[in-house]
Amino acid sequence: MSENRTRERNMFSFQSHRFLISQRFPESVPSSREIAQSVRDLTRRHNAWFKDCIPLIASENVLSPASREVLNSDLHNRYAEGLPGKRYYQGNIVFDEIESLCEKLAKEVFSAEFADVRPTSGTVANLAVLQAIAKPREKLTAVAVSDGGHISHAKIGAAGMRGAKIYNYPFNEKDMNIDPDGAKKLIREVKPKVALFGQSVYLFPTPLEEIKEAVEEVGATAWYDAAHVLGLIAGKRFQDPLRQGMDVISGSTHKTLPGPQHGMILANLRKEGLESNIRRGVFPGATSNHHLHAVAALAVTLAETKEFGEAYASQTVGNAKALGQAMHELGMDVLCEHLGFTESHTIVVDVQEHGGGKRVALDLEKANIILNKNMLPWDSDPVRPSGIRIGVQELTRLGMKEAQMSEVARLIHRVAVKNEAPSKVKEEVVAFKRGYTKVHYCFFEGEEASDYP
């Protein structure tokens, strides 16, 4: 882009911002108090809007009332570095108990020998693991972003920032999964330091047991990014990576595990030094303070997962399959029909003949149906991909079951395929969603999900 074009673009952005401010405060330049009040009003507006939306983003969920309560506690104002009993700050006497309990719950829920609950996000957890198990310029194998791999596994993401030399597994586009024979061949040829598995478009379990022989043969550390499926693993409805040859699991804690926006690392301790390396990778490596309020909310979520996790995971997968079937019966091109569409919370739909993923996602947003465009393996343009990604974990959390998936499919179809006016469909979306605004699969079940002062 030329210097003049860049200047014009920046000026347009500035003028647009001034226009929006002037529309909200037409009389004069707003005071700081007015701006703060505006933010509060906009936040209330967002809450009210989402209460009337069908949320289908595969990487989101809603907190339980108990988790939300501790997230909003004084812990938000406090700071901690290090581990319980070995802090660099005073004032953590009570929080030490909370963090220790959270780690204990994580190990119990996932049957793990080790847990670290300090990473502040999934990508921060990935950075910590990378620092723990790989040096810059060492080799790493992973799923390509175009095949559903996460951006943090790519050259432009966390793995690239760490300096890893990245090699992508051969991918079976029809089955939307790693090709196990191709993966074994790649691992034996490349001899990576790290074999990384896991995706952000994750329909089916990775064939870990077929691949682990090659991983062990070359002495690689086996790492599984479970961000999208952590709750399904906890609920015994996906796969069990720590029993299938994986050394380390990382993940965010706010997708199918319906906790706060945070991160977590789990491990088996078969490799010497792994525990201490991960601890150093987390602090001082990838974090300083680790968001005490989120650790407390995660502890509550894990306690709820022990009690409700299996039922929640089972219903989530059942809903995803039902939605895939309903959309397929309406004539939409849902991927992997021959495999039952999915074994996770996610389905993927090719909407290229209906204008592509970007157009469909924008039109659905106007109808209060919230999902995202997504690249499919045969796409080359991430801005205008041919697919959409749909996750049902939040609808499940709000009490929907298989019967409601038919109505969700019908509403999507009317906008995406029949090209009905989004404003017309929006009225039905709002009426439909009003019956599903309370949180389920948790303590204090039945309280509102989107209450805001």
Report each predicted region and the residues it spans.
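N-terminal glycine-rich, Lys/His-bearing helix-loop that initiates the first secondary-structure elements
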Residues: 2-101, 213, 434, 439-453
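PLP-dependent enzyme catalytic core of the Aspartate aminotransferase-like
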Residues: 10-15, 21, 318, 382-453
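Conserved PLP-enzyme active-site core in the AAT-like
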Residues: 16, 21-25, 101-333, 351, ...
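Short Gly/Ser/Thr- and Asp/Glu-enriched loop/turn motifs at secondary-structure junctions
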Residues: 51, 120, 293, 338-345
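A short glycine-threonine-serine/GTX helix/turn-capping micro-motif
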Residues: 56-58, 281-289, 397-399
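Flexible, glycine/charged-enriched surface loops at secondary-structure junctions
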Residues: 84-85, 114, 289-292, 309-315, ...
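Short, conserved charged micro-motifs
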Residues: 273, 354-361, 398-403
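Conserved small-domain helix->loop->beta segment predominantly found in fold-type I
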Residues: 302, 313, 317-361, 371-386, ...
